[in-house]
Swiss-Prot record:
PROSITE patterns: LRR (PS51450). Belongs to the LRRC3 family. The keyword Plastid does not apply. It is found in: Membrane. It comes from Homo sapiens. The chain crosses the membrane at residues 205-225. Widely expressed; detected in testis, lung, small intestine, breast, brain, heart, bone marrow, placenta, colon, fetal brain, liver, fetal liver, thymus, salivary gland, spinal cord, spleen, trachea and adrenal gland. GO terms for cellular component: plasma membrane. Residues 1-32 form the signal peptide. Residues 33-64 form the LRRNT domain. This is Leucine-rich repeat-containing protein 3.
Amino acid sequence: MGTVRPPRPSLLLVSTRESCLFLLFCLHLGAACPQPCRCPDHAGAVAVFCSLRGLQEVPEDIPANTVLLKLDANKISHLPDGAFQHLHRLRELDLSHNAIEAIGSATFAGLAGGLRLLDLSYNRIQRIPKDALGKLSAKIRLSHNPLHCECALQEALWELKLDPDSVDEIACHTSVQEEFVGKPLVQALDAGASLCSVPHRTTDVAMLVTMFGWFAMVIAYVVYYVRHNQEDARRHLEYLKSLPSAPASKDPIGPGP
């Protein structure tokens, strides 16, 4: 009667190891895409669609091989520094229709080379630091933001490659020059207007107040000096009048023969 041999330990070990590796691979695939998003993969290039997901912040687990990232129509209000720095293959980033209030100098660090389109339209951005977007070679959409038009914004815009299809929709919500409010900013700048030639009103007011104060002090000193001299002259004249008059001297020499 033949004996039944148990399975070889080596084969069992290999089978268990392969099962674990397969399980880990499946778990990795499941975690490669942010939970509320869709991440179709085409020939190793991932497109991440997170539109209309109610997101309040940028997901942290975006695949590194993402080429298209749609984060539009969410509730994102803050972009942390370096939020996209691991996405070296990213070509298009859509952040439109959010509640973004500000962008920092390091917000888009790591995207300088490959990014082709950055959509920041329909947000709440008021100011743009000069070094926040200047290193990007992408076309940038900034329309429908409550921009405060000042010299710093003008200098920042000159460094950007603005999307020509939406450039005329970039308007001033507030401005250091009231005539710019509500008007297409780039058109005004192209026509020769400048936001950098506006005098600082606060400085001017302080200077005028200082000058007026010095002028008032000079006038007061002159008035005091004149009145003081007039008073001295009056007292001196009264003193002279109070002196007794000397009698007329008689000629000691008599009349000639």
